[in-house]
Amino acid sequence: MKKRVVAKAVTAIKKTAVLSPAARDKQVNASFSENALKMMKKRYLAKREDGTQETPAELFHRVARGLADVEKTKYGKSATEAAKLEAEFFDIMANKEHTPAGRTLTNVGNGTPIIANCIVLPVMDTLDDIFQTLKEAALLQQAGSGLGFSFGHLRPAGMPTKRTNGMSSGPIEFLKIYNTSFGIIKQQGRHGANMAIMPVHHPDIMDFIHCKKVEGEIRNFNISVGITDEFMKAVTEKPDAPWLATWNGKKIKPHRVLRSPNGAVIGFEELDITAKQLFDELVEGAWFNGEPGVVNLDEANRTNPLPQLGEIDCTNPCGEQFLHHYDVCNLGSINLSAFVKNGKMDYARLKQVTRTAVRLHDNVIDLYAHPVQKVTDRAQGTRRIGLGIMGFADMLYKMGVQYNSDAGRAVGEKVMSFINEEARKMSQLLAKEKGTFTLWQGSVWSKKKMKMRNAALTTVAPTGSISMFTDCSSGIEPNFALYFTKQDKDGLQYKYLNPVFEAALKDRGIDIDKDGIMEELIKSGSVQNLMSLPKDLRDTFVVSMDISAEDHIKMQAAFQKHVDNSISKTINFPNSATREEVAAGYVMAWKLKCKGMTFYRDGSRQVQVLNIGDASKIKSTTDAIGSAAAAKQIEKPLNLLMDQHRLTPRIRPEVVSGRTYKVKTGYGSLFVTVNDDELGAPLEIFATLGKSGGFFQEQSEALCRLISVALRSHIKVEEIIQQLKGIRGPMPVMTNKGTVLSLPDAIAQILEEHVTHATKPANEQAQVAELVAAATAPVQQSKEVKAKQSLASYGMMPGCPECGGNLTLKEGCMACGSCGFSRCG
């Protein structure tokens, strides 16, 4: 039997008097699994000049020493006091009880500027501001920060720009510029994460919802729609009422941004849409590939601790930190699984670790040296920290409590309430010791007359990497599976067998390699179909796909009651989930006051981070996913692929303007009208030839209808001209501008003239004069042409109407040498 390579559990290390420092460090290093070490070497363990890397114990010593030194250098503590704090900081990390987030682990004590994981930057509505923010963002990305941006302040596509007297390209075009720029920057062993948010009342919201419909597009951003109570009430209470966007304080119709096949903005059309219809578009995106997510802006601002700074409009990349512009938060998480002793929580130890962690993260702020000074200044003003949790699902496993139950939610509420309360008590103690955050006056804490060191304290981050090296479940998420393969952004794969489950089987004397247990785990990741296992084990060891979306949402809402900021959580759906189920989930989460909502339907992306099944069948991820996205679309169901790429004609505006041309054809004078859209591009075409109901009139009408549909579907006019120009008919005719071979050729020539030579009349009177001149000039000129030219001057050989062969001039008449057709009879 082949040996399994899986993550093994290691009991939390406890410092004892009998261990020397060297022995203690050796024990710490030995406590990490193969997977954990692989990931730590890639991301967190510093490299020495000789090419070797530090050990995990050395990492923790480096971080603990660097943060404890703050107490001496800034707050005047003695060396003994600082050493005591250093030992406490080291212990909570070495015991896997608490872990700071990645940037803190990587940079503290390493001679590298200390920066926060999470920052929000403004994107305001001037070109100078847009590119100033991009410059600041590039510097912060390079340093290792994750960034959030609200693109809701940018004017909609098609709006006038004063400086250039042109029209705005719209927020999505600038989002693409940011995305491309960030794709070039790679942070210390990791790709930069970014969040783009647009409020639901922005006129370009439809364009935003669909901007990541093709997998691999805008791949350096998560996107979320900022919903409001007004919008959700309209969805649930007035589903048929029109929905109006808001811009500059005015209610206007939302619009669809029109793009050419190469993606360039060519215009926009107003939409008559209800809130429910817009909501359905959002749901469709979430159902299709998990994006966009949703953030509840009104709920976030109801709990905004710094109302004097204005409303919050954005979050960090993972959505758990609602921040003002230039505000920051450093994250860290308590591993709840480490506090279970004999099936019960050790709340005394949890209290100690919580308070130590608050001090640790407060000290991180004093070391900040962001490449953008405004960020460091704001951090000193608010002193936000994001103390969260991980290992919750494993904690429930050890306690024998089912995740998707009232008991599970009660445990979650109790432990989060305890941590939140202890964190606040510690912040009050630090305020007495070191002073309040400088923006305390005007905050919610000043109104409550509570002296606080930190504006906000708790959050729940996804903990993807730090939970990997502590071998525990992520955040408040249920385990994805009891056996799975995790794939990171660089394509590296890590196999995991849940250590708590493996230990539970061992305690009961159950052999995992018998009765098809391991085979079922590899196949499905779940034990729900293993009836040979005791029922209490099957009830306790549930995984994400065993849990209904409703229970996922209820758990998130239970935690949200006791979290200062927000929670990063994914609501997992099976692949068979319907759009209606996703929609119901969004409504439920809003009603339960969840601040953020991310839904994911299993298998709806070509590449996903966690996978169940044989590793050989799991797709690898590389930086080339963007360029490969189109090829990978063949994996989509055919109907979804067709929907994704189907062209839809835009709605015709009620009023358009254009020009009418007259051209002589072999069948009489053809009058062609070309109408333009608001940007001056051809929108539709009409042609009149002969009497209504005649053969040539019906042909020209049919042709013009198809051309108009193509134009309104954003097909390039040059493509249409190329297809029609040069088509030969049996009755060509000469004009002063050359040969007109057929009706299609005549229409193509007029379209070409319209887009390449026509100039817009200065006013309506000039337009009328132009039309009159156009209508009379060809007639006068044709008389002169007739006198000077003969049939031999047709130039290009027209086609025979009978067989398609060439017509030639014979005996004063056009005749076909192939079939004998003669125009003269």
Per-range role (PLM):
Residues 247, 353-376, 380, 384, ...:
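Internal maturation/activation junctions in enzymes
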Residues 34, 319-322, 361-366, 450, ...:
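Catalytic alpha/beta core of large soluble enzyme barrels
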Residues 797, 813, 821:
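Residues immediately within or flanking Cys/His clusters that coordinate Zn2+
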Residues 613-669, 779-796, 802:
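Short, Gly/Pro- and small/polar-rich lid/capping loops
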Residues 14-86, 163-177, 187-190, 194-304, ...:
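Conserved, charged catalytic cores of large soluble enzymes
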Residues 684, 690-772:
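Phosphate-backbone binding interfaces of nucleic-acid-interacting proteins
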Residues 46, 65-73, 90-115, 119-163, ...:
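Function-dense linear segments that define catalytic or interfacial modules
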Residues 800-803, 816-819:
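Short cysteine-rich clusters marking metal-coordination/redox-active sites
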